[in-house]
Amino acid sequence: MLRYLTTRLLYTIPVLWLVVSVVFLLIHLVPGDPIQQMLGEGATASDIQSLRHAYGLDVPIGRQYVNYWKGVLHGDLGRSLRLDQPVTRIIAQRYPWTLQLTLAAMIVALLISIPAGVRSARRRNRWDDRALSFVSLLGLSFPNFALGPILILFFAIQLALLPVSGAGTVAHLILPAITLGGSLAAILTRMVRTAMLEELSQDYIRTARAKGLSENVVVYKHALRNALVPVLTVVGLQFGALLAGAIVTETIFSWPGIGRLTISAISSRDYYLVQGCILTIGLTYVVVNFLTDFFYSLANPRIRQ
């Protein structure tokens, strides 16, 4: 067990290093000078050089790369060019909002997909099974950048039930969570249906029915419990997709999370803030996948062999 987890952990380190390194290289290859952009056209060469030196941008890119990783190892992600604040402080303020949105989206997806998937499996090939399959397929076809404006138009503008943007209350969280969790709910509904159909065909289910157990006990106590093991694993693996989707969702709803911060940092070419955001998102993805592997290995010891 310990050897398996150690191996999985060692695999994550080069992946995280590669992601941050590629982002570092790409953002430095984009034409233009962020210092010039920040100071404006009226800045003198002396002003530009002075500020480049202050942010460590006056040395070769290789040296900047080494200096950046030295800072990371000491917990220093640099200083934002645009906001003139430590990147760690900015991310610490924004990250909890993204985590809140992502967890809410996962809860929404599970609350929708588990009952829908179970219902679809129990009513296989009947009208409600076909209807749920059609709705889940429709959900897969709707990206969050299309679903978000539709929800805003209907619930916020036409019905005036929920706020359009902002954060701070449960009402502000509802539309972004549904937007972000919609596609995941569609994926999980199909997975729950498939897993339930497989479990309901097993011998132990026939034995439980032969003992006279009620259908609800057979379905929810026996079949669903086993069917959820692979489903919950997919939930963990889909966490990265939710983080990526949060970038668009936060922009649509003006949610003050790290996704919206990343877009803003990229548009202003804020080197250190972009790298800090990507590092944080990558680290979150790696940690969640590691925990998913850990809990799945507990539930299914065969994968450790």
Residue spans of the language-model regions?
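Hydrophobic alpha-helical transmembrane segments of membrane transport/permease proteins
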Residues: 15-66, 156-175
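Hydrophobic alpha-helical transmembrane segments of multi-pass integral membrane proteins
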Residues: 17-21, 103-107, 146, 150-151, ...
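Alpha-helical transmembrane segments and their lipid-water interface positions
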Residues: 74, 147-148, 197
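N-terminal signal-anchor/signal peptide hydrophobic helix marking the start
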Residues: 6-16
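Membrane-water interface segments at the C-terminal ends of transmembrane alpha-helices
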Residues: 22-29, 68-70, 134-163, 179-183
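Alpha-helical transmembrane segments of integral membrane proteins
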Residues: 2-4, 91, 95-128, 157, ...
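An internal, D/E-rich "acidic patch" concept
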Residues: 58-114
